[in-house]
């Protein structure tokens, strides 16, 4: 018993200083990477691209008869579970925007597709910078990946929603205990979806190896922050509705912008946590050292990519 208590004390004595050093390094790293500025930039790009993304997604789903009415279900699910409060105003605005795009020509549709690709490209660049990745993917590979996201992504989302709706309509679960467990699962489903979405983002986007444990920790932190921010943002909007007095009918626009900004801030914080966990040797660095280390890592990545390209050509 004494040996166990001693071992716990030893682990605790190592854990506390290590945690303090990690959080200090994390704050310095986020300061260097200007996370708040990049979140605002991505929010701006997202607002410009959100209608093109929804239009491309819904247009692809409409090509398959099996996904009939899935588009409306998808919009409702996203707004109800991922947009806190004022969902009706945001839903109405998005539906009007998307319906208006149906009147566009083929050239306009091509521009919408390009805008959607630009959003994915900017996400890719920002996350790879957090991981100090200078070795860019080949343009053909990047375009293929973006194309798969825009084409296969909507199909997978539509299939999952269609299957879920079909299973829930069967009413296979009659037992009260199982029904309670099923309802509990549905309540936790948004958190689980957020976790796996962040996990996939932190694993697939960086052109660099990411450890499973690091990605899971970063995704868990981001998912919890996302759920807490939903509740906090909804409380603020409902209890302090000053935005309606100022903006009136246009209140949905600043609400949506602030919420998208918070979402990207959480995404980047989770990415910073994941990347910082893999840099244990730098946890004791000061801010100036972090600046120089980041520049050195980017330079080294670039020189390695050029060397590998030269050796391949030879």
Swiss-Prot record:
Major localization class: membrane
Keyword Glycoprotein: no
Keyword match Transmembrane: yes
Residues passing through the membrane, by range: 41-61, 104-124, 143-163, 185-205, 217-237, 249-269
Membrane-protein topology: Multi-pass membrane protein
Compartments (UniProt record): Cell inner membrane
Superkingdom of this protein's organism: Bacteria
Key words, A-Z: Cell inner membrane, Cell membrane, Membrane, Transmembrane, Transmembrane helix
Gene Ontology CC, one term: plasma membrane
InterPro entries membership: UPF0761_bac, Virul_fac_BrkB
PANTHER family: INNER MEMBRANE PROTEIN YHJD, UPF0761 MEMBRANE PROTEIN YIHY
Family per similarity comment: Belongs to the UPF0761 family.
Name recorded for this polypeptide: UPF0761 membrane protein VIBHAR_00593
Organism: Vibrio campbellii (strain ATCC BAA-1116)
Lineage: Bacteria, Pseudomonadati, Pseudomonadota, Gammaproteobacteria, Vibrionales
């Amino acid at each position: 018993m004494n040996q166990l208590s001693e071992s716990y004390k030893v682990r605790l004595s190592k854990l506390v200083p290590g945690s303090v050093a990690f959080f200090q390094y994390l704050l310095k790293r986020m300061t260097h990477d200007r996370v708040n500025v990049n979140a605002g930039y991505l929010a701006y790009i997202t607002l410009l691209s959100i209608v093109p993304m929804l239009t491309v997604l819904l247009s692809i789903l409409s090509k398959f008869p099996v996904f009939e009415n899935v588009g409306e279900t998808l919009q409702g699910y996203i707004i109800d579970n991922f947009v806190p409060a004022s969902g009706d105003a945001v839903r109405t605005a998005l539906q009007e925007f998307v319906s208006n795009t149906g009147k566009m020509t083929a050239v306009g549709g091509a521009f919408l597709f390009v805008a959607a690709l630009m959003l994915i490209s900017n996400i890719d660049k920002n996350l790879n910078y957090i991981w100090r990745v200078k070795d860019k993917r080949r343009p053909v590979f990047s375009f293929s990946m973006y194309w798969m996201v825009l084409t296969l992504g909507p199909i997978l989302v539509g299939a999952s929603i269609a299957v879920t709706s079909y299973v829930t309509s069967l009413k296979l679960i009659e037992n009260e205990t199982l029904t309670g467990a099923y309802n509990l699962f549905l309540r936790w489903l948004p958190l689980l979806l957020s976790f796996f979405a962040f996990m996939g983002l932190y694993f697939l986007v960086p052109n660099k190896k990411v450890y499973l444990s690091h990605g899971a920790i970063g995704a868990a932190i981001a998912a919890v922050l996302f759920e807490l921010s939903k509740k906090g943002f909804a409380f603020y909007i409902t209890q302090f509705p000053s935005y309606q007095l100022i903006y009136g009918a246009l209140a949905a626009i600043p609400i949506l912008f602030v919420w998208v900004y918070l979402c990207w801030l959480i995404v980047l914080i989770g990415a910073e946590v994941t990347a910082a966990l893999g840099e244990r040797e730098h946890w004791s660095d000061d801010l100036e050292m972090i600046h120089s280390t980041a520049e050195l890592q980017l330079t080294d990545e670039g020189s390695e990519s050029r060397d590998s390209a030269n050796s391949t050509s030879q």
